[in-house]
Design a protein with these regions (language model features):
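Active-site environment of divalent metal-dependent phosphoester hydrolases
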Residues: 45, 71-76, 99-100, 161-163, ...
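Metal-dependent catalytic neighborhoods of phosphoester/phosphodiester hydrolases
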Residues: 77-86, 104
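Conserved beta-strand hairpin/beta-sheet module of binuclear metal-dependent hydrolase folds
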Residues: 2-56, 166-176
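Metallo-beta-lactamase
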Residues: 6, 42, 62-74, 99-157, 161-226
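Short internal beta-strands
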Residues: 90-96
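Structural motif
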Residues: 36, 62-65, 171-173, 224
């Protein structure tokens, strides 16, 4: 069974939950002079990421950077484990998320309170990342991917107060994390178009900030979204 598919411009979509590539969380690999992973999912997705890298003949040692749009566990819970396996990689995250990736104790405690007996199955292990391997990214920062290609980062709050998006200069696509909503390709509106619902996470949902993030994304000369 394949856990990835090539989308465009050497961007691969990775299944972060085995067997649910089209209907569940996704991560992305940008393959090129620099190999970049965007989103890690929770640690149980680790084996499918490594399997995909092996199939594509990319060594974990060849991963240059791992980017998380925000630190919610379905997007970044497996970052510590994957960083151990990608020894050359730098982890990129918004400044407000840095301390929780270097010391995830609060993330673990909060998840255990919510998921209780299901915590181990869904998220274990959540491992700390050495501070020296974490680089913070803020509004307007860029990452050179080589060959004239770059990612530009923007703060996009509303779902979380540390959420960023990345705009790819080559594909003209936005890696949107959760701020563009939850995409349902099997649910359609009256015109037959797929529907995306706002992702209103508890505690940090801010409708005004989310609307501002929508305006930001609409202002970019984008051709597609990578949910």
């Amino acid at each position: 069974m394949s856990f990835y598919k090539l989308l465009r411009n050497n961007i691969f979509q990775l299944a972060l939950v085995p067997g649910n590539l089209q209907n569940r969380a996704a991560g992305y690999l940008i393959r090129g002079p620099k190999n970049i992973l965007i989103e890690t999912g929770a640690s149980p997705s680790n084996s499918t990421i490594l399997s995909t890298l092996k199939t594509l003949e990319i060594s974990p040692e060849a991963i240059d950077a791992i980017i998380v749009t925000h630190i919610h566990l379905d997007h970044a819970g497996g970052a510590g484990l994957l960083m151990q396996q990608c020894p050359r990689a730098t982890l990129l995250v918004h400044p407000r998320g840095r301390k929780h990736l270097s010391d995830p104790a609060k993330l673990i405690d909060g998840a255990k309170q919510v998921y209780q007996d299901d915590f181990d199955r869904l998220f274990d292990p959540i491992l700390p990342i050495p501070e020296e391997r974490i680089q913070t990214i803020s509004d307007g920062d860029t990452l050179d991917l080589g060959g004239g290609r770059q990612l530009q980062f923007y703060e996009a709050f509303g779902h979380a107060r540390h959420h960023i998006i990345a705009f790819d200069s080559e594909s003209r696509g936005i890696f949107s994390g959760d701020i563009a909503g939850v995409f349902h390709d099997r649910i359609h509106d009256r015109t037959g178009q797929p529907i995306s619902f706002p992702n209103t996470a508890p505690t940090q949902f801010d409708p005004e900030e989310m609307n501002a993030s929508y305006d930001l994304m609409m202002s970019l000369q984008r051709q597609c979204f990578f949910y």
